[in-house]
Amino acid sequence: MLSDAQISRLLDVANAACHGGNVVDARAVYAGVLALRPGFAPALMGKAMSHIVVDDFDEAERILKDEVLAAMPEDEDARTLLGLCYTLAKRRDEAEAVLDPLATGEGPRAELASGLLEKLRQEP
């Protein structure tokens, strides 16, 4: 069994791979972590991001809604990522519905939500 620190390092590697364009390897690591810890939200959100970066917004939405938010509806990180997904997919109404409540808070999530809303509202 892997320790929490080892799992965290694996997710760091997967996230770096995903952001570097190596989506296939990133997904393999996410799958490995999920095999050890089914339903583990950080791995599921990484997996969703691996779909967002290749414009597979429908699968990212499915993962976030059906696997993360179904288990933890108040997870603000997952909701923020869903808002990003909707923004990039140009689904303005859905993005605003998700991001508006998040933008009223404080901290990095609120700043990201506010920035995404500003971007949405500047587009025709």
Q: What is the predicted function of each stretch?
A:
Residues D4-V29:
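Alpha-helical segment of the N-proximal tetratricopeptide repeat
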